[in-house]
Amino acid sequence: MRRITHFFGSLFLVELLRGMMLTGRHLFARKVTVQFPEEKTPQSPRFRGLHALRRYPNGEERCIACKLCEAVCPALAITIDSEQRADGTRRTTRYDIDLTKCIFCGFCEESCPVDSIVETRILEYHGEQRGDLIYTKPMLLAIGDKYEAQIAQDRAQDAKYR
């Protein structure tokens, strides 16, 4: 009996019709492709994009040159030099991030005890040469100053999960 059923099923091309029905169902379904430069998907507050260095509200930079971010970076993309100030505190003289090495893992952000280094929602940035993708301390501070409101809002939304 099974052979007869199989014979008539293959004779009338039932499998072919089932496959075409499945294809037709997906043909008229809603498309999931996003045309990226024109359309943008919403980003999470935890999005890991371009790095920024933050300042305190009084204008002083947050980084205390503990070098935890440099130590924890698996790609060795962060370079920090520091020196002692007259008041005994240690501050950075050089803070470079090489974005050609960076894998945007977020370990630097997690290890920072004073919330100095953060990853922003900035996704689109480019460089004409390799050297353009090495971000220095003044560049990172400028990004932090420009996007501080958005960074603070994202940190506040994420605070209950940290």
UniProtKB/Swiss-Prot annotation:
Q: Name one GO cellular component term.
A: plasma membrane
Residue ranges of the 4Fe-4S ferredoxin-type domain? 53-83, 93-122
Any single Pfam family the record assigns to this protein = Fer4_7
What is the protein's major site of localization? membrane
Question: Which Gene3D superfamilies does UniProt cross-reference here?
Answer: 3.30.70.3270
Residues that bind [4Fe-4S] cluster 1? 63, 66, 69, 112
Keywords, in A-Z order:
4Fe-4S, Cell inner membrane, Cell membrane, Iron, Iron-sulfur, Membrane, Metal-binding, NAD, Quinone, Repeat, Translocase, Ubiquinone
Q: Extract the InterPro entries matched here.
A: 4Fe4S_Fe-S-bd, 4Fe4S_Fe_S_CS, NADH_quinone_OxRdtase_chainI
Cofactor binding comment, as recorded: Binds 2 [4Fe-4S] clusters per subunit.
Query: What are the protein's GO molecular function terms?
Result: 4 iron, 4 sulfur cluster binding; iron ion binding; NADH:ubiquinone reductase (non-electrogenic) activity; quinone binding
As its record notes, the protein acts as a catalyst of: a quinone + NADH + 5 H(+)(in) = a quinol + NAD(+) + 4 H(+)(out)
The record's note on quaternary structure and interaction partners says: NDH-1 is composed of 14 different subunits. Subunits NuoA, H, J, K, L, M, N constitute the membrane sector of the complex.
Q: What is this protein called?
A: NADH-quinone oxidoreductase subunit I
Q: In which organism is this protein found?
A: Thiobacillus denitrificans (strain ATCC 25259 / T1)
